[in-house]
């Protein structure tokens, strides 16, 4: 999914600030 792709692109931010974890 797009969320997963974005999450991989910015792993450092993933789950910290982004609404999609």
UniProtKB/Swiss-Prot annotation:
Keywords from the named record: Amidation, Disulfide bond, Toxin
Modified residue annotations for Threonine amide: 21
Species the sequence originates in: Polybia paulista
Gene Ontology MF terms: toxin activity
Disulfide topology: 7-14
Name this protein carries in UniProt: Paulistine
Modification after translation (UniProt): Occurs in oxidized and reduced states which are thought to adopt a compact globular and linear structure, respectively.
Family classification: Belongs to the sylv/frat/paul family.
Purpose: Induces transient hyperalgesia and paw edema in mice. Probably exerts its effects via different pathways in an oxidation state-dependent way.
Taxonomic lineage from the root: Eukaryota, Metazoa, Ecdysozoa, Arthropoda, Hexapoda
Keyword Kinase listed: no
């Amino acid at each position: 999914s797009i969320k997963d792709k974005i999450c991989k692109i910015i792993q450092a931010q993933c789950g910290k600030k982004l609404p999609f974890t």
